[in-house]
A protein has these predicted regions:
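Small-residue-rich helix-loop
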Residues: 1-101, 136, 158
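Amphipathic alpha-helical interaction/assembly segments
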Residues: 37-60, 97-162
Length: 162
């Protein structure tokens, strides 16, 4: 009995954002399902994902102003393991993609708090799934030729079945 209890996977939101930045789609979806099953608050999960998106934007903006990477990390409040992940994904993200992701995080925030949006799922966890998939798509896509970065689109409502 004790070994069965010890084998139960525990998911945490910090590992979720690391998996998102690593582009590990299957792991991210499994972790989201696990967090939901464990009763984690959707608002807390959203906060961590949105904070990661905001951090990417802050660091990208600081780099765009010509600041060195360590200064950009300090200004973006990015420390530890996330620095290595940010270094990998920042070259993949255009400014307009980050602006779109910030907007998507804002829409998802509303959905998680009970607001409806015509292009987003009504269920908070489905909206979170949509948001993390947008971010995973952005960080897993190879860079486009300069000036031609792909635009992420909210598109039609994403319906995922477990």
């Amino acid at each position: 009995m004790e070994s069965a209890v010890l084998n139960v996977a525990r998911y945490d939101v910090f590992k979720l954002t690391e998996a998102v930045l690593a582009g590990q789609t299957a792991r991210v979806l499994r972790m989201l399902d696990g967090l939901r099953a464990e009763g984690e608050a959707a608002v807390l999960v959203h906060w961590h994902v949105a904070d990661t998106i905001a951090g990417l934007k802050r660091v990208k903006d600081a780099l765009g102003q010509g600041k060195p990477l360590p200064v950009a990390f300090n200004e973006g409040r990015v420390w530890g393991v996330k620095q290595r992940l940010y270094e990998r994904v920042l070259p993949l993200l255009a400014e307009h993609q980050l602006a779109h992701l910030v907007e998507a995080a804002s829409i998802c925030d509303g959905v998680v708090k009970g607001l409806k949006h015509p292009l987003w799922p009504l269920d908070p966890w489905d909206a979170l799934r949509h948001l993390v998939l947008l971010l995973v798509q952005a960080v897993a896509t190879p860079p486009a030729p300069r000036g031609k970065a792909p635009m992420l689109r909210a598109g039609p409502r994403l319906v995922l079945q477990a």
